[in-house]
């Protein structure tokens, strides 16, 4: 490797309160330092890139400071793979955009030859990695099964794990068969790892989300249908109650009106009958009073 890549080193597992002048104090004796780029991710540990004037100085710094104990943190010093002289996106591709090789935010490694990482669809996930594992350690171990084009180490609630991309399908299948349940080791730790085919979260979440959405829509439609039927049944059941409640009132009002209407007729009818009977009796009483004079005239 030539150019700026060979003059730049990657320093990982730095303390969270590290300053640039402290980094300069650690590496100044190996040669003239051109630039120091310190990275402080949201989660520790920190890491940095140090660029020397000569590539020989960078090699001496790696030999002298790799494994150096700084305030209880064991430094990891290695040659920067695409970490310097590239854009920020290339740096993220070379080192995962943050964190050292110790899982403090993850690390990704691309091709050491070109300093550029590339992904593929032939991906495996590696569980059971020690917390001190770096992407370079993972790549070196998984390279036993085939050509690795990308490696990344990160951490979740289950611990430290890695993602490895192979250039072809056969190497991926061979890695699952050969490297599953094998011992992984680096200078600081060792452990048995599990290697499985990587399944993206999208493919996992698609089918449940569809089934859930369908079941929810069905349950909602059923619930709505039931609510409509209940509302209809309630409206139907309420209607007779209203009729029943209204009908007695109407019948009562009608009965009351009927009972009220004849009462004045009855009260008024007796006077009419009395007046008629009185008039008839008067007429009858008048008629006999006129008859005696006629008899008298006949007798004369």
Curated annotation (Swiss-Prot):
Modified sites of kind Phosphoserine: 207, 209, 231, 233, 239, 259, 275, 285
Keyword annotations of the record: mRNA processing, mRNA splicing, Nucleus, Phosphoprotein, Repeat, RNA-binding, Spliceosome
InterPro entries per UniProt: Nucleotide-bd_a/b_plait_sf, RBD_domain_sf, RRM_dom, RRT5_SRSF_SR
Biased composition (Low complexity): 253-262
Major localisation: nucleus
Coiled-coil residues: none
Entry keyword annotation includes Phosphoprotein: yes
Subcellular location(s) of the protein: Nucleus speckle; Nucleus, Nucleoplasm
Compositionally skewed regions (Gly residues) per UniProt: 94-110
Role this protein plays: Probably involved in intron recognition and spliceosome assembly.
Complex and partners: Component of the spliceosome.
Additional notes on this entry: The splicing pattern of the pre-mRNA is regulated in a tissue-specific manner and by development, and changes in response to various types of abiotic stresses and hormones.
Protein name: Serine/arginine-rich splicing factor SR34A
Species assigned in the record: Arabidopsis thaliana
